[in-house]
Amino acid sequence: MIESQRHSYHLVDPSPWPISGSLGALATTVGGVMYMHSFQGGATLLSLGLIFLLYTMFVWWRDVLRESTLEGHHTKAVQLGPRYGSILFIVSEVMFLFAFFWASSHSSLAPTVEIGGIWPPKGIGVLDPWEIPLLNTPILPSSGAAVTWAHHAILAGKEKRAVYALVATVLLALVSTGFQGMEYYQAPSTISDSIYGSTFFLATGFHGFHVIIGTLFLIVCGIRQYLGHLTKKHHVGFEAAAWYWHFVDVVRLFPFVSIYWWGGI
């Protein structure tokens, strides 16, 4: 069939992963709601749904890597699809984070009488922005420089240098996640402490979750680079990871200025 096709597009074979992913997502959602409302079996259904969903993600991406790396189905025309999809996904994530920052700004610019008409609310402790938050802020942009180094190394065909750069990126990402964990451990307030706690932990936690996802993405890229999967002309997966990581490291500046610094004084 491949030999007879006269176009540059990849006609994928029938796959069970879309339906299995849908079932895993359904079980995760229903199980999560049941667990939050203390229904019997909610935790079990949630755990099974997550396991099924993670397994589906693993085997589905495994098949995509086989089709692109080993079978050569990802032509230039096919590569445009993942590129456009990655860009649109990042745009949707920007809108997500914009909503959280909007909520924080709205609450701080017009504090209600229920919280004393001041921001931060009366009686709520806040983190000192000039300690761990300030120390943590330049780490992600530094990791962004390291991932750019890796990209240039791939384009130059220097495989070992690309691996070293990706290792440096991942290490900086882990340090950043560790610092954020220290922030939360030392935080004088919780997510249930008024609108300040809700917006603070939701915005910073959502960004921290993106850092973890991006770190996993880069770890996979590092393994693939070590195995020789990425070449000068075929490294769309790495490009998507690099774009995502630049989004993550730039966004870090916004919570520091609007939440830690301006919103916490």
Swiss-Prot record:
The chain crosses the membrane at residues 16-36, 41-61, 84-104, 162-182, 200-220, 245-265. Keywords: Membrane, Mitochondrion, Mitochondrion inner membrane, Translocase, Transmembrane, Transmembrane helix. Its EC number is 7.1.1.9. It is an enzyme of class 7 (translocase). One of its GO terms (biological process) is mitochondrial electron transport, cytochrome c to oxygen. It is found in: Mitochondrion inner membrane. CDD domains: Cyt_c_Oxidase_III. Belongs to the cytochrome c oxidase subunit 3 family. This is Cytochrome c oxidase subunit 3. The lineage of its organism: Eukaryota, Viridiplantae, Streptophyta, Embryophyta, Tracheophyta.
